[in-house]
């Protein structure tokens, strides 16, 4: 959630309140905060907490016509000290130092590093911290960055890159903006619900996290800009995935390919618990095999389920399975296989 208002296509209205005293016509007093705005913001964060939702508070962003993105360094620091001090007591707050920091080229790396120190100094509770990109990535190895908040920078490769990013940065990966379900003219906002769901599954099985968004233009309000009702087809499927992930045992991680397991596992991601061979979750994405063969770990027996991630259906296969097995599959996209040791 942004503290400063956003000016962009489909989102051009003035907000009811501003963080600083003043208005667009008469100008803003960058030495005086508007208490009505901040009280309303606190109420909204509290409401999110009541719904079990984390608030990733975006402190700075470039989509601006009021002058907030062009404040000088001293004013930025003054604002950040106040914002973080006022909001850090909420347990559901995260700090996004910027949305698309690279679209603010007048702010230097030295500026961002200073702002990060201000945030840490003013937040005794150590909430999560990130800095989000448009095209150019910030140095995500910086120690103040707790997790990588990353926008996909390739038209086609999105959640598939989670494996590479996890290995590169050794931090949790949050794919913020893997694209949006919708039908607008921009390439980032017109993928199908099926593709959005696939990206969520792909990213989660690879050990990452993803954010959802929706931009359908035929409705009075565009959810991405204004909130309101969701009209897309993927939210229920994402909720289904959330239930699947909640059932994943502690200690699971993406399967690491080795010369021994490469041939059987190179083509689909797998989330598993290799320490005791107790759990395997394979996701096939847009592949649609008629069958799949596995050589199960010696001495282990499994219950096996076919999961239709789009129809949100789980089919338990009859019997107990061990050794070399062949699993019949429906030649359908977006399937998964789950194996649980008994």
Map each language-model feature to its residues.
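Alpha-helix C-terminal capping segments
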Residues: 87, 165-166, 296
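Active-site mouth of glycoside hydrolases
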Residues: 1-158
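Aromatic- and carboxylate-lined catalytic core of secreted/periplasmic carbohydrate-active enzymes
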Residues: 181-184, 196-318, 328-342
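A short linear-motif detector with a strong N-terminal bias
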Residues: 72-76, 108-109, 126-129, 151-154, ...
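Short strand-edge motifs at loop-to-beta-strand transitions and within beta-strands
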Residues: 323-325
């Amino acid at each position: 959630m942004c503290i400063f208002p956003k000016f962009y296509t489909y989102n051009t209205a003035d907000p009811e309140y501003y963080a600083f005293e003043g208005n667009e016509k008469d100008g803003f007093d960058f030495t005086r905060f508007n208490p009505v705005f901040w009280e309303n913001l606190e109420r909204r964060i509290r409401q999110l907490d009541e719904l079990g939702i984390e608030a990733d508070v975006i402190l700075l962003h470039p989509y601006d016509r009021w002058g907030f993105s062009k404040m000088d360094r001293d004013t930025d620091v003054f604002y950040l000290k106040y914002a973080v001090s006022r909001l850090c007591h909420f347990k559901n707050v995260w700090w996004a130092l910027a949305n698309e920091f690279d679209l603010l080229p007048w702010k230097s790396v030295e500026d961002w590093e200073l702002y990060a120190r201000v945030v840490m100094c003013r937040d005794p509770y150590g909430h999560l911290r990130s800095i989000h990109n448009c095209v150019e990535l910030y140095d995500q190895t910086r120690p103040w960055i707790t997790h990588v908040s990353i926008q996909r920078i390739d038209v086609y490769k999105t959640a598939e890159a989670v494996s590479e990013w996890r290995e590169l940065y050794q931090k949790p990966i949050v794919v913020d903006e893997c694209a949006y379900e919708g039908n607008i003219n921009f390439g980032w906002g017109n993928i199908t619900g099926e593709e959005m769901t696939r990206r969520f599954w792909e990213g989660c099985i690879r050990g990452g996290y993803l954010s959802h968004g929706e931009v359908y233009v035929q409705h009075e309000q565009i959810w991405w800009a204004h909130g309101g009702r969701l009209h897309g087809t993927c939210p229920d499927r994402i909720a289904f995935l959330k239930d699947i992930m909640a059932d994943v045992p502690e200690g699971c991680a993406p399967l690491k390919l080795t010369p021994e397991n490469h041939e059987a596992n190179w083509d689909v991601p797998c989330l598993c618990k290799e320490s005791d061979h107790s759990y395997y979750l394979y996701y096939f994405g847009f592949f649609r095999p008629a069958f799949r063969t596995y050589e199960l770990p010696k001495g282990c027996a499994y219950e096996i389920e076919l999961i239709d991630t789009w129809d949100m259906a789980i089919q338990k296969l009859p019997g107990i399975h061990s050794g070399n097995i062949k699993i019949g599959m429906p030649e359908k996209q977006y399937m998964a296989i789950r194996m649980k040791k008994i």
